[in-house]
Every structure is written in C-alpha cells, then in structure tokens.
Amino acid sequence: MTALEQLQALPIWQGTVRATPLGGGITNVNFVAEDDNKRVVVRVGDDIAVHQIMRFNELSASQAAHAAGVSPQVLYHAPGILVIDFIEGRSLTADDFQDMSLLGQAIDLVARAHREIPHHLRGPSLIFWVFHVIRDYAATLQTGG
C-alpha cells in the first residue's frame, strides 16, 4: 500500500479527503490533508532500525511538545502513521533572522522547548543523537557489518 493509500484509508476522515505532498521527509512521506472538517499534516513512515529511527519516540516527543505548548496536537496515530494539526506558516530563512525581534522570538521558542518538553515526556525515551548514530555506523563497518 502506498503512503497516499495509507492516508486515504485512515478512519479519521469525514467526507472526501484531499491530500497534497509536503516536502521535507527524508525517512517518511508527508502530506497536508483535508476533509470536510479539518486540515492536518499526515506523516507516513515505518521504523528504520539501522538508522535508529523509532516512530514511538517521535510520537512521545510530539505529544510532549504539544503539552509544553510548542507544537501542534497529535490527533491520531497508528503504526507508521502520525496525524497532527495543521498550522499555517512558512519556513524562515537566514534573511528573516536579521530581524532581531524575530530572532529573539526564535531563541525564546527553542529555549522553551529545551526547558519544557522534558517535563512532559512519558514512558521510555530513547535518544536520537546524530553523533551516536554515526559512531554506530562506524562500529558496524569495523565489525564487517
């Protein structure tokens, strides 16, 4: 089943669902989807153990980030599927951060995320630390894997 077919089969839709691919996902496929009542972002992607990507961690982090007030709400999840509220916006550019007011807001948001999200994490919280992933790749190569 393709990512789009998985999206269309979700039990959350009312009426016709329309989906538009959303760029960015390296290890998942993302869509902006809407039905007669809501507009959401749908992420479709399975665990990739060799890269230490485990979607239950993403779910836990997303729920904690919402509880901390820095991320949209998780509306639905199933193995390989995450559905969150859609927030209208745009990606900021380097030029945007020349505005000291906007830069200050961004710094405050990142600080708040680092300070508040850990207070809302529940259950097992494994890390995804790029330096550890690279070390693990190197060890795998050294052992002939």
Listing of model-derived features with the role each one plays in the protein:
Residues M1-R18:
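Juxta-kinase regulatory segment immediately upstream of eukaryotic protein kinase catalytic domains
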Residues P21-W129, V133-T143:
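ATP-binding pocket architecture of kinase catalytic cores
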